C-alpha cells in the first residue's frame, strides 16, 4: 500500500491510496462469493454462477463496493499512523482499477494545526450581585401580582397603571379614517417602552381626559397618522396582603409562613444571580479567546453548529420557523455565530490537550455527589447510574471537561470582581 497526503487548505486534505492486487483481490473474491449466493442468471442454478459471469454482469457494482470498503479501512489505519484528526467523514472522490493496482482518492476536513496564544495577561471583570431586602420585596411583589386586583382610581395615571381608552384614527389631513375606531382598548403602561408615543402621552392623564398621539411612518415618505385617545378609566394594581394563607396558596403549601417563603425567595435570587455571574464570566472568557485566536474552522463543524442553532430556534417557536421566515435566510444570519461556536470548540479542545485533561469515572461520581448535595430530593447513587448510562455518559464527559477547561483558564488569568445591583425585570 502506498499513500500520499496533500494539504488543500488549513482544514482540508486529500489522501491518495494505491493498493496492489494482493491487497484488493481478496475483497473482490469476497464480493463475488456474496453475489453468487443471490444472483440469478438464466441457464445457471442459484449459487452456481461462474465467477467470470458474475464479474461481467456486476463488475462496476463490485468494484464500487470494494473501493468503498477499502477506502474506509485504510483511511482509519492511515489516520492513526499519521496522526490525522478528521473533522468530517472522508468522501470517496474517485477510484480506478488499472490492472494490478487500485487507486483511491479521498477528500476530508481536518482539525487545523495551531497553538493557543498565551493568555496569562488576560483580565476579566466578574459582576457580583448582592441580594438586598429591597430586591426580595420586589421579587415577592412580582410573584403576588398574579393574585392582585386592578381597581379604578381618580388620580392621574402612573407609569405602571393600566388605561382603558377609546381611539379614533386620523390621516395626515386630519380626516377620520372610516372603520378605524377602537373602543375599550387596554394600555398596560408598565410594559410599553418609555419612548413609546402612547406611553408618553398617557402617563399623568385622568379619566375623562383626551389626548392626541402622532405616529410617524417608519419608512421615509410613509404617511403619518394621528390618534385621538379618550381616557375612560385608569386602573391600578392592588397587591394582596402577604400572609401565611396567601403563602400557602402561592407555594402550593410548600411553605406555611411568610418568613419561610421570604427566605426561599432570597435563596432563589442568590442562586440565580450567582449562576448569571458565572455564566456571564464564562461567555466573556470564550469571546476573548475567539477574538484573540482566529483559528480556521472546518465548514462541516460550522454546519453542525448551524444546524443546532436552527433546531433550537424551531423548538423555541413550537417546532418550526414562523410563516414568512426563510430557513436559508435564518441560516445565513446565524452562520457567524455558528463559526464562533466551532472556533471555541477547537480552542477549548487544544487547551484540554495541552493540559492533558481527561474525565474519569471518579470525576463523574464526584459530580453526581455534588449535585445530590445541592438537591436533597436527588439520590447520589441513582444519579451516578444515570450519568454513567449510554445515553448520558458522553454528555456528562463533555460537561465535566468543559468545567476543567474553564478552571485551567480562570487559574491563569486575572479576574476582578465588581459589585453590581440586581438588574430590573418586570416579570
From Swiss-Prot:
Q: Which reaction does it catalyse?
A: [protein]-peptidylproline (omega=180) = [protein]-peptidylproline (omega=0)
Q: Which residues cross the membrane?
A: none
Q: Which UniProt keywords apply?
A: Cell cycle, Cell division, Chaperone, Cytoplasm, Isomerase, Rotamase
Cellular component aspect of the GO annotation: cytoplasm
Q: Name one GO molecular function term.
A: ribosome binding
For the biological process aspect of GO, one term held by this record is: protein transport
The PPIase FKBP-type domain covers which part of the protein?
160-240
Respond yes or no to whether keyword Cell division is given for this record.
Answer: yes
Q: What's the stated role of this polypeptide?
A: Involved in protein export. Acts as a chaperone by maintaining the newly synthesized protein in an open conformation. Functions as a peptidyl-prolyl cis-trans isomerase.
* Identification of the protein by name: Trigger factor
Amino acid at each position: 500500500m502506498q499513500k500520499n497526503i496533500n494539504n488543500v487548505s488549513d482544514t482540508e486534505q486529500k489522501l491518495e491510496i494505491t493498493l496492489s492486487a494482493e491487497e484488493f483481490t481478496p475483497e473482490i473474491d469476497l464480493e463475488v462469493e456474496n453475489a453468487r449466493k443471490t444472483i440469478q442468471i438464466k441457464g445457471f442454478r442459484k449459487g452456481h454462477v461462474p465467477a467470470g459471469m458474475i464479474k461481467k454482469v456486476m463488475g462496476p457494482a463490485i468494484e464500487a463496493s470494494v473501493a468503498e470498503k477499502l477506502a474506509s479501512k485504510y483511511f482509519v489505519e492511515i489516520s492513526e499512523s499519521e496522526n490525522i484528526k478528521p473533522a468530517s467523514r472522508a468522501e470517496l472522490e474517485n477510484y480506478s482499477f488499472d490492472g494490478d493496482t487500485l487507486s483511491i482518492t479521498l477528500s476530508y476536513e481536518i482539525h487545523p494545526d495551531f497553538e493557543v496564544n498565551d493568555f496569562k495577561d488576560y483580565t476579566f471583570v466578574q459582576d457580583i450581585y448582592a441580594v438586598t431586602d429591597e430586591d426580595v420585596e420586589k421579587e415577592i411583589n412580582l410573584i403576588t401580582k398574579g393574585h392582585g386586583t386592578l381597581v379604578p382610581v381618580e388620580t392621574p395615571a402612573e407609569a405602571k397603571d393600566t388605561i382603558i381608552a377609546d381611539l379614533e384614527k386620523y390621516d395626515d389631513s386630519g380626516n377620520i379614517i372610516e372603520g378605524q375606531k377602537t373602543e375599550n382598548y387596554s394600555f398596560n403602561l408598565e410594559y410599553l417602552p418609555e419612548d413609546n408615543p402612547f406611553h408618553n402621552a398617557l402617563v399623568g392623564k385622568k379619566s375623562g381626559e383626551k389626548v392626541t398621539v402622532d405616529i410617524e411612518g417608519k419608512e421615509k415618505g410613509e404617511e403619518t397618522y394621528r390618534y385621538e385617545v379618550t381616557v375612560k378609566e385608569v386602573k391600578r394594581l392592588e397587591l394582596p396582603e402577604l400572609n401565611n394563607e396567601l403563602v400557602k396558596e402561592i407555594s402550593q403549601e410548600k411553605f406555611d409562613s411568610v418568613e419561610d417563603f421570604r427566605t426561599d425567595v432570597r435563596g432563589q435570587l442568590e442562586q440565580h444571580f450567582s449562576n448569571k455571574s458565572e455564566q456571564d464570566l464564562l461567555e466573556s472568557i470564550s469571546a476573548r479567546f475567539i477574538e484573540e485566536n482566529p483559528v480556521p474552522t472546518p465548514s462541516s463543524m460550522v454546519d453542525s453548529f448551524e444546524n443546532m442553532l436552527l433546531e433550537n430556534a424551531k423548538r423555541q417557536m413550537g417546532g418550526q420557523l414562523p410563516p414568512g421566515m426563510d430557513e436559508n435566510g435564518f441560516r445565513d444570519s446565524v452562520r457567524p455565530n455558528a463559526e464562533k461556536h466551532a472556533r471555541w470548540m477547537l480552542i477549548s479542545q487544544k487547551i484540554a490537550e495541552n493540559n492533558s485533561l481527561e474525565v474519569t469515572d471518579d470525576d463523574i461520581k464526584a459530580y453526581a455527589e455534588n449535585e445530590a448535595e445541592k438537591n436533597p430530593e436527588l439520590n447520589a447513587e441513582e444519579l451516578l447510574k444515570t450519568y454513567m448510562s449510554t445515553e448520558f455518559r458522553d454528555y456528562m464527559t463533555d460537561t465535566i471537561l468543559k468545567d476543567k477547561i474553564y478552571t485551567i483558564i480562570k487559574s491563569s488569568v486575572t479576574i476582578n470582581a465588581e459589585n453590581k445591583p440586581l438588574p430590573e425585570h418586570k416579570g
